[in-house]
């Protein structure tokens, strides 16, 4: 009886031991699962206009594919309004909440790099990665030779004109003035010079560059009231009678006015194609290279991926930036708004040689990037107001630009 009892006791002990081991194994598995969860890193990316649909479809798709390839990295998007973007970046940085990645106009890189907000990504980029990019496009993301931004969008400009009214597009400023005058009839204006805060400066800069002007010199100092820039505004005054109100007209109004038979010519970029094609039957159009002043010129505009200097996940953030720079992903971004190639392989697409894109592609050979100023918002506001006052006769071109120079050079 005693032996039988000991045998039963032994079986019972072995059973408890097995249960204990199983429980221990379950605990280990649970710990593994928890460790996996702890290993997941969430990075945040600031995208202007995202809530209004800007690149929302493209980034939603790309983020989904990135997270599938990188299960330990999650990407969350933060939206901001275009006009508040730069101030939002400063506020978030000062509150120690700057997103890991921020989409910014390359024109603002000097401001944010000098303020310590941006991370220098020069050492993160391999030679192989750099070689994928068109060199002078990649250079728009540099400040003082350092790569504070990696371009993700590039736009150029063309002259859109009514092909049924204008037999040959104007090739220089004198011809532009004459054609604008000839086509200002009834409700139709011959040309447009928008001066809105959101986009007007880029369109004004086309003419500044065509006249051999600049905004800052080689040392980064303002030269806004230069002889060349005053001459540009004097030309604008000649055009003033043939353009819609420059103060209230925005760049986004131009294509709508064109298809409504209210405008004969305007300057803009590839994003206008959808609107223009819809009106082709009643308002046929063609695209030409921008008319030249003393020289050919166009404003080269890029937006860039940037990284916060206080990000705790710089490695993961750069992985996403690198992912977005792959050909298959960059092509989707470029196509979203009729932009132009960032990468060499993108430029091989034959569509950039068609009648719509070719004039905008060819003018980029004579392009100048937006000026890198100490504070873009301050410059943008002061400069556009100066142009408005000159065009509306409130001040002479010299007086308007003198005021702007004095205000910004303080």
Task: Enumerate the language-model features and the residues they cover.
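Extracytoplasmic "Venus flytrap"/periplasmic binding protein-like
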Residues: 62-133, 140-142, 171, 257, ...
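Long, aromatic- and glycine/proline-rich binding clefts that accommodate carbohydrate-like moieties
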Residues: 285-288, 334-385, 389
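Conserved N-terminal structural module of periplasmic/extracytoplasmic solute-binding proteins
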Residues: 7-8, 20-111, 270, 292-295, ...
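Short, solvent-exposed loop/beta-turn-alpha elements that line the ligand-binding surface or hinge
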Residues: 122-133, 189-191, 195, 213-231, ...
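Glycine-centered hinge/linker elements that transmit conformational signals in sensory
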Residues: 179-183, 219-248
């Amino acid at each position: 009886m005693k032996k039988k009892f000991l045998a039963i006791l032994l079986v019972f002990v072995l059973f408890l031991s097995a249960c204990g081991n199983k429980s221990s194994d379950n605990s280990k598995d649970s710990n593994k699962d928890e460790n996996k969860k702890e290993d997941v890193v969430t990075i945040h990316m600031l995208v202007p206009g995202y809530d209004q649909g800007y690149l929302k479809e493209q980034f939603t798709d790309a983020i989904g594919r990135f997270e599938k390839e990188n299960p330990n990295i999650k990407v969350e998007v933060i939206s901001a309004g275009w006009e508040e973007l730069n101030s939002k970046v400063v506020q978030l940085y000062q509150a120690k909440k700057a997103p890991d990645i921020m989409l910014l106009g390359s024109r603002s890189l000097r401001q944010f790099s000098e303020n310590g907000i941006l991370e220098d990504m020069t050492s993160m980029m391999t030679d192989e990665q750099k070689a994928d990019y068109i060199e002078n496009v990649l250079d728009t993301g540099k400040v003082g030779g350092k790569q504070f931004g990696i371009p993700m969008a590039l736009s150029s400009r063309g002259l859109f004109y009514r092909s049924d009214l204008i037999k040959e597009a104007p090739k220089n400023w004198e011809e532009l003035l004459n054609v604008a005058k000839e086509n200002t009839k009834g409700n139709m204006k011959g040309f447009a010079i928008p001066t809105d805060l959101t986009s007007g400066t880029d369109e004004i800069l086309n003419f500044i560059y065509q006249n051999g002007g600049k905004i800052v010199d080689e040392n980064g100092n303002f030269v806004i009231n230069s002889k060349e820039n005053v001459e540009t505004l004097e030309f604008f005054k000649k055009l003033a009678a043939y353009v819609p109100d420059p103060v209230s007209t925005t760049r986004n109004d131009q294509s709508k006015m064109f298809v409504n038979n209210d405008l004969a010519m305007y300057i803009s970029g590839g994003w206008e194609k959808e609107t223009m094609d819809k009106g082709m039957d009643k308002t046929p159009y063609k695209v030409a290279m921008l008319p030249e002043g003393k020289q050919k010129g166009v404003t080269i505009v890029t937006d860039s991926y940037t990284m916060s200097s206080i990000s705790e996940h710089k490695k993961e953030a750069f992985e996403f930036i690198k992912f977005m720079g792959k050909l298959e992903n960059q092509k989707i971004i470029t196509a979203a708004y009729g932009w132009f190639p960032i990468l060499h392989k993108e430029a091989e697409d034959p569509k950039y040689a068609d009648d719509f894109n070719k004039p905008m592609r060819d003018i980029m050979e004579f392009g100048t990037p937006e000026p890198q100023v100490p504070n873009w918002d301050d410059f943008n506001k002061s400069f556009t107001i100066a142009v408005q006052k000159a065009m509306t006769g409130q001040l002479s071109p010299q007086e308007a630009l003198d005021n702007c120079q004095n205000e910004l050079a303080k």
